[in-house]
Amino acid sequence: MKILRKNHPLLKIINHSFIDLPTPSNISSWWNFGSLLALCLAIQILTGLFLAMHYTSDTTTAFSSVAHICRDVNYGWLIRYLHANGASMFFICLFIHVGRGIYYGSYVLSETWNIGIILFLTTMATAFVGYVLPWGQMSFWGATVITNLLSAIPYIGNTLVEWIWGGFSVDKATLTRFFAFHFILPFIIAAFVLVHLLFLHETGSNNPSGLNSDSDKIPFHPYYTIKDLLGVFLLLLALMTLALFFPDVLGDPDNFTPANPLNTPAHXXPEWYFLFAYAILRSIPNKLGGVLALVLSILILAAFPLLNTSKQHGLIFRPITQIIFWIFIANLLLLTWIGGQPVEYPFTAIGQIASITYFIIIIILMPVSNTIENNIIKL
């Protein structure tokens, strides 16, 4: 078996990626989230496939088809809630994975990091089009509000919006194409994941100390397969607890009402994992400015490798940047809270301050602290 896995053309690839892969001996539990994201993607594709068997992408029957899945399909309610809450678990793991990358300086592996940003954007797009499919009130108005933002693009904006809608409003054509996008995008994500892993295994993984670990490597299996299994069980425990005990806690009550183009909800708000970006969008009074800030709030992650001037890898021995990093996390949580609040004082003012702080930390404070710490080392 050992000879087969090392010589067989297909098994050899799996062997070099998951069995005999030389891995730093000191990587912590923060490195578990990559495998957990792969698990989340597998759960989402599997549950999504079963949901697609019973769902109809037509404005007249979409809402009732979701109700039919929950009421009449064997364990349909479980599949639906695993899929809905699986998306939340996916984004929790994604945020932690990106946060770990920032904290431990994984962005220096620029190819892996940039593919990761593409994965992040693709996952956000998938979640957005998926949220429209149940055709509830918040689904409909979320689709209307967010797609309408494209009209801020000069010259081609209005044409682009009508092209995406497939008409002059969000209607049957929009729902059909969103279902098509939602079905195909996870497979595109899976392809990008393979590219992400390919680039990662070209350079080898980073480690918590930020030091070169070439002299201290251990095989991935059995050490990290067992360690990843613990993460898998904890994730499944959290997901099953959410799906079985609190299935609707992260959803919006407005989505229990069928979509009505003549009745606007009191507060149109996206899913919780988009609230930080939504708060940044709302904090700028100008429409085009808001859209640019929204896009930049994600694309600014690509600036980390460019703005990094530190002589050290990661933040483990850098107390000043550590403090700035945790202020950044607190600011992100504040933006998430603000995104769910109504557009009125003092929430708008707090949102504007937090949005400015978000960009200042990444563009100014972190590079400045890098320079200060470099000078301290020289002393």
UniProtKB/Swiss-Prot annotation:
CDD domains: cytochrome_b_C (cd00290), Cytochrome_b_N (cd00284)
Protein family: Belongs to the cytochrome b family.
Residue spans crossing the bilayer: 33-53, 77-98, 113-133, 178-198, 226-246, 288-308, 320-340, 347-367
Source organism: Akodon serrensis (Serrado Mar grass mouse)
Record GO biological process: mitochondrial electron transport, ubiquinol to cytochrome c
UniProt key word Iron: yes
Keywords of the record: Electron transport, Heme, Iron, Membrane, Metal-binding, Mitochondrion, Mitochondrion inner membrane, Respiratory chain, Transmembrane, Transmembrane helix, Transport, Ubiquinone
Descriptive protein name: Cytochrome b
Domain of life per record: Eukaryota
Cofactor: heme b
Residues the record lists as binding heme b b562: H83, H182
Any GO MF annotation of the entry: ubiquinol-cytochrome-c reductase activity
